[in-house]
């Protein structure tokens, strides 16, 4: 037993020799190249002054601290809230929301805090699980109350922002009741915070702004102002620019429930603007571009007086002066622009609101002049770089609405400017200005169609598709027409609507050479290829529109061929290969038209649907057929 007894400290005392003795001992009796085995190097802490204390071992790595681990007494690592939030988010991203809810409810109480519950509530709202999100909110209130915590402002903000994403409130009436309840709970939360700390960061009106957006989507305009007048006039809970912006946006969402139009909303917006100026002077907040743009949109659908007031806001805050003349494009708008009367730099959403004001007030010339003024503005005040595709398409629609000579030429210049601007911009933002099918369709099917301008239509077709219409002209025919291979998204395939417009423009130009050029182009593309679905998930509406324009194109082709046959002259007689091409086209379009007529002549079978009789309450059968 003495052998297994605990040895004393003196037994294992090691006398460390001096450095010179260690060196001699290491070289004697050891072959060359061999190493002496030794224990790992450790350093003792200098803090252990008492000889009875055990020295604290420090590892070599200065980045490792074993005492920094959040461990229990038994050595288990505790679950931290941020790790739990990451796990919950990963489950929700994978569609396992119910599993995430079960994980949170079964997690340790130390890992459950308000931000973790907010994370899961937001994930449920993103997945449109609105009922589950509200149940989590009520459950969180009970669980947090037991531990001395309560939902914070971020909780109410998360709930309101998620509910404001609902578009059809008629099918979510229960969620509207929940929104009212959440707003009342938030106001109680604000009152409790103000009693303890009047300067707390929890005092924010962001949830109220989201609640006002919900009220505007439902059309409860009177309730919006009830909320507005219930707020403080001064302090952190006074109306600010975020809340007032939400109020203007709510007035422009739905018409007034009593009158059924936006005239009363515009008058209310004018009153609200005066309240905005008073609140700005009282609370010292700055009026920004979002606030002014929202006010302009709310005023744009009102009376002429309200619209004139909106144009005054455009001039005061953005420096765009409405033109004086009404007969054409006013060059004075550009000269007035140099006065620098703007106080807010123009942004894309602000310019979109201004163009919407011009459209709603039926003043398309104002939109054209404002666009020209923005092209000459410096970038520091909102120059050409803020213009995107939607702005240009709005100007193209303004060109359609006014009777300006050579509007198709001006429209083509706009599209060419878009393509040049796309090259200048970085690739990350270049797509916002790139013309799409809608842009080219406005130019060809509407603007060029009104003027029957074949030259501009052919140039626009080249820019859109990558073809060269020059290869289909008389005397310039190519057996293999050129097709430019450009980067992805720039070549747009021709559709039946575009080709039908091209055929109508050629016929309207009363030029036989243009008609022949259009027929060669259509024959090369092929009418049958236009009837094929563009993708497997093509909607029924898109399919019906495609067949409609194919039928319209077929009628245009027949009309063009008849013109060429009926009015030919000895000097303008069709060639043999053109005659073969037209015969092929005529046979193809007649087959398409006969097929369409057969579909329209189809008589559907009569189906029966039970209809309840109001007299005796018994269900009877009533014959229903498609109206002729």
Tell me what each language-model feature is.
Residues 2-628:
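A basic, Ser/Thr-enriched alpha-helical scaffold prevalent
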